[in-house]
């Protein structure tokens, strides 16, 4: 019996600035690293997806994933599910494994919000009178968070020793680092380059880009 491929929700139509940055890229990247095939359920970012989709993804966002009878939403949860199911992208040693899981949550809870608030002000409200001042006020906190990541990474190539779902999540945040604050830390600049040079990342991003159609709202 042939196993069904997992299906991930993704956008087929987004503004130009979002191309190559939408969060389904994280899941595509993990699946490419694992050598697992998948299908996409494409949606329109410009319009509400409707009640049927909201039962799958309560916040009407992407990604969500359906794998057989299992439905999951939130990119961190999907990454953890895939790593545990396929026994890949998580270290085997308990200490390293839990370090990877801790860094997965740290990326989502301690680093991403600091970068996202800058992106929101600079990209979505860039024409507002208050935008520049808000961005400058937010920068020190984001820089401090990134400095902590750099210090923890140190001379290691990856956060938990070997490449893991934590690195997929952390590195993907730098795609939306509109001020390129991570590049102020030489350790993170090199880390970012290592991550984005991986063939699986490049395949995942190419696949996401191939799914996009027009950028303009109908």
Show which residues each predicted segment covers:
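GST-like domain detector, emphasizing the conserved glutathione-binding G-site
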Residues: 1-133, 140
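A generic structural-conservation signal
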Residues: 40, 91, 162, 204-205
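Short, solvent-exposed turn/loop segments enriched in Gly/Ser/Thr/Pro and often Arg
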Residues: 44, 165, 208
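GST-like fold's C-terminal all-alpha helical module
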Residues: 107-197
